[in-house]
Amino acid sequence: ELTDRVIAEPSKIDVAERVCEVLGVESDSVPACSDGEVVDALGRSRLGVKIQDGCNHRCTYCIVWKARGPERSVPVESVLEQVREAQEAGVPEVVLTGVNLGAYYGKSATDEHVEIDELLEAIMERTSIPHVRISSVEPMDISERLLKVMARYPQRIAPFLHLPVQSGCTATLHRMGRPYSAEAFEDTVRMIRANLPQVSLSCDVIVGFPGETDEEFEESLALCRRVGFSRMHVFRYSK
């Protein structure tokens, strides 16, 4: 086995102590590690704002759901405060990040649940940050509501989406546990481009997934060519 143990992200500060237990040494002999420092945003052109963590999906190639736990979202007011702080520090662009960004379901000041499109609208209306960029969004979480918000603010919201398609073959996608077909993904791309004609699309693709035949690989390659991604992150499958 290549992996003996997976430690969840919130427990990373305990890694040194656990390693000491395995090695049989005193943890006091290991230099202490702080809980982290706030990164000085002055002079930076872009700053990540984490709005979500965790994942409820069970894709067969992924261990993130175990490492990061169930989906949870940062409250709307907290997100807005972070964006304003970045703006006051002179940062011209914030990037909204999360393990499963499209699953954002944070609470508002009135205790109502807010989805990603509503959060983006709130950032536009209640902050003056010059530019906002959305990081990776699962294909099945792309909604026309989100696209219309992006289209309403072309000068402030980057016309960019990263779509972790993983494969362009429906049979491979099913083995991966992905909840969409290759055809459904292309329908999503058409919807995106109908609302955002100038959009730039990037993607993640896994090659060599267990059971993938030469024919399935060619199907995946053909889809990528039809879509015409601006950039691709290609990963060879590994255990």
Regions found by a protein language model. Give the residues of each.
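Proteins enriched for Cys/Gly/acidic motifs involved in redox and nucleic-acid/cofactor modification
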Residues: 1-105, 115, 161, 183-194, ...
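Conserved SAM/AdoMet-binding glycine-rich loop
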Residues: 1, 88-214
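Generic structural signal for secondary-structure transition and capping sites
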Residues: 24-27, 128, 155, 229
